[in-house]
């Protein structure tokens, strides 16, 4: 690692004086509008000629020699005095000002000049004395090997820390002429400044080990925030899963809706066909004729215990009852002889079946065969069988 260059106090002092002389050169000269190279300062007219003239004048002013050191400028205004924070024996009695950074009334438009030997302001107000001294002391401390002025001034107070100053009392100031005195001021300066003492870090050699310490534990509220974020992440994941399930279920619901719609259409078709069949066949729904059912019926004896009521008595039935002496005897009910049912007129039904065969059957051979069967039928059951065969052939 390259060593940092060091400078003596004389070299630093020369650099500071050269800089102050340059600043004084520009501050002591009046500002001329034609020396500015900005186009905003050029009046309307021939712009190129005026700009070239301004550049020529600026080059001539830049070629002038710069004053190597700061000189005292004499003015006709009364002189003001200002004191620094150094040794008070350097100035005459009753001349220091309590705070040199406090503005002093001055005529407007005047510049500032300071005599470093006597510490007096020749004209106007000067606000940068302390700043210039502080910068000079900082340069001396950094680039010189000897002790700085700040260290020498603060060596008297062992409790002094960087950033803090001692409490100083101000005396009544004299402005060097007629006028009201500004009075006295007291500036409160703390012993311990805003920047606390920091121990200097010693340089580490190549052989010395590196000190490693565990990282500080996070604050409790940070842990709580992390836990809250994790909980929110879990809830978001669960919500995403539920949303995916809902989307999958919506597809199934759409398919079910389509199936229900098709089923409704099929049911409506079946209902229409059933209505047509009822209109065409309004007779008995069973294929068994009534006569066959009657043949299957058999007489079965029934014993009724207890008193006999008229509701149990059927006319035309053979009943044996017990009289007062418990003797069996035939009942006194009259037997009703059932008459055979009269034959129905099948002409209308035959005409309906012939018309149905003409409408539903397309082949003429089958149609002629069905019509012959209709004319040959003598019972209603035969006509019903023919009707069913016509409907089956039509489907």
UniProtKB/Swiss-Prot annotation:
Region (Multimerization): 220-283
Phosphoprotein keyword on record: yes
Listed InterPro entries: P/V_Pprotein_paramyxoviral, Soyouz_module
Oxidoreductase as UniProt keyword: no
Keywords, sorted A to Z: Phosphoprotein, Viral RNA replication
Gene3D superfamilies referenced in this protein's UniProt entry, alphabetically: 1.20.5.300, DNA helicase RuvA subunit, C-terminal domain
Bias kind Basic and acidic residues: ranges: 158-172
Regions of compositional bias (Polar residues) in chain numbering: 143-157
Residue ranges of the region described as Disordered: 143-183
Quaternary data: Homotetramer. Interacts (via multimerization domain) with polymerase L; this interaction forms the polymerase L-P complex. Interacts (via N-terminus) with N0 (via Ncore); this interaction allows P to chaperon N0 to avoid N polymerization before encapsidation. Interacts (via C-terminus) with N-RNA template; this interaction positions the polymerase on the template for both transcription and replication.
Comment block on domains: The N-terminus consists of a long intrinsically disordered tail. The central part contains the coiled-coil multimerization domain (PMD). Forms a four-stranded coiled coil structure. The C-terminus constitutes the alpha-helical domain that binds to the nucleocapsid (N-RNA complex).
Its job: Essential cofactor of the RNA polymerase L that plays a central role in the transcription and replication by forming the polymerase complex with RNA polymerase L and recruiting L to the genomic N-RNA template for RNA synthesis. Also plays a central role in the encapsidation of nascent RNA chains by forming the encapsidation complex with the nucleocapsid protein N (N-P complex). Acts as a chaperone for newly synthesized free N protein, so-called N0, allowing encapsidation of nascent RNA chains during replication.
Entry's family note: Belongs to the rubulavirus/avulavirus P protein family.
Name listed for the protein in its UniProt record: Phosphoprotein
Organism of this sequence: Simian virus 41
Originating gene: P/V
């Amino acid at each position: 690692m390259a060593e940092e260059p060091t400078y003596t106090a004389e070299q630093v002092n020369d650099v500071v004086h050269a800089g102050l002389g340059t600043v004084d050169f520009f501050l002591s000269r009046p500002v001329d509008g034609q020396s500015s190279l900005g186009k905003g300062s050029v009046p309307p007219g021939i712009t190129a000629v005026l700009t070239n003239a301004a550049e020529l004048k600026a080059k001539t002013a830049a070629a002038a020699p710069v004053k190597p050191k700061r000189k005292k400028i004499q003015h006709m205004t009364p002189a003001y005095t200002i004191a620094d924070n150094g040794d008070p024996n350097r100035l005459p009695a009753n001349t220091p000002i309590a705070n040199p950074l406090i503005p002093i009334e001055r005529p407007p438009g005047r510049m500032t000049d300071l005599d470093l030997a006597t510490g007096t302001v020749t004209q106007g107000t000067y606000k940068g004395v302390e700043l210039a001294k502080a910068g000079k002391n900082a340069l001396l401390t950094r680039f010189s090997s000897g002790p700085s002025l700040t260290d020498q001034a603060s060596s008297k107070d062992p409790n002094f820390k960087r950033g803090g100053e001692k409490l100083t009392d101000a005396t009544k100031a004299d402005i060097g002429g007629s006028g009201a005195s500004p009075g006295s001021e007291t500036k409160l300066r703390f012993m311990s400044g805003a920047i606390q003492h920091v121990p200097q870090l010693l340089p580490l050699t190549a052989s010395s080990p590196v000190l490693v310490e565990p990282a500080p534990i996070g604050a409790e509220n940070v842990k709580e925030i992390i836990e809250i974020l994790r909980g929110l992440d879990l809830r978001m994941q669960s919500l995403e899963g539920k949303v995916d399930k809902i989307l999958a279920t919506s597809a199934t619901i759409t398919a079910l809706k389509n199936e229900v719609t098709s089923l409704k259409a099929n049911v409506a078709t079946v209902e229409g066909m059933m209505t047509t069949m009822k209109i065409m066949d309004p007779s008995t729904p069973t294929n068994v004729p009534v006569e066959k059912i009657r043949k299957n019926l058999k007489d079965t004896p029934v014993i009724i215990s207890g008193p006999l009521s008229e509701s149990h008595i059927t006319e035309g039935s053979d009943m044996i009852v017990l009289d007062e002496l418990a003797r069996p005897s035939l009942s006194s009910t009259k037997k009703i002889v059932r008459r055979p049912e009269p034959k129905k007129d099948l002409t209308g039904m035959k005409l309906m079946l012939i018309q149905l065969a003409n409408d539903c059957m397309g082949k003429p051979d089958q149609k002629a065969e069905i019509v012959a069967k209709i004319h040959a039928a003598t019972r209603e059951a035969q006509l019903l069988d023919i009707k069913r065969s016509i409907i089956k052939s039509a489907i």
